[in-house]
UniProtKB/Swiss-Prot annotation:
Residues 1-23 form the signal peptide. SUPFAM superfamilies: omega toxin-like (SSF57059). InterPro entries: Hwtx-2-like. Keywords: Disulfide bond, Ion channel impairing toxin, Knottin, Secreted, Signal, Toxin. GO terms for molecular function: ion channel regulator activity; toxin activity. GO terms for cellular component: extracellular region. Probable ion channel inhibitor. This is U3-theraphotoxin-Cg1c. It is found in: Secreted. Expressed by the venom gland. Residues 24-51 form a propeptide. Its main location: secreted. Belongs to the neurotoxin 12 (Hwtx-2) family. 03 (juruin) subfamily.
């Protein structure tokens, strides 16, 4: 059991080292910028927050919408607790 744990830890360490070295190589080639990583994540989170919108039927006589509609997300996302979640 200890052998398997040691193998798993070493494998994870090798994968992390490989990932970091690959990221540094791409950064050195100006393929990615370090600040772009966080900007992309923030944009995705903002899209999730605002993508979940409340849709409702407008009455024929022109009255404003009431809360009888349903929440919808676009692009294959589903609304869970007012956030769009990808399933």
């Amino acid at each position: 059991m200890r052998t398997f744990t040691l193998i798993a830890i070493l494998t994870c360490a090798v994968l992390v080292i490989f990932h970091v070295s690959a990221a540094e190589e791409l950064e050195a080639q100006d393929v990615i910028q370090p600040e772009d990583i966080f900007t992309g994540v923030a944009t995705l989170e903002e899209d999730r927050i605002f993508e979940c919108s409340f849709s409702c039927d407008i009455k024929k006589n022109g009255k404003p919408c009431t809360g009888a509609g349903e929440k919808k997300c676009s692009g294959g996302w589903r609304c869970k607790m007012n956030f769009c979640v990808k399933f």
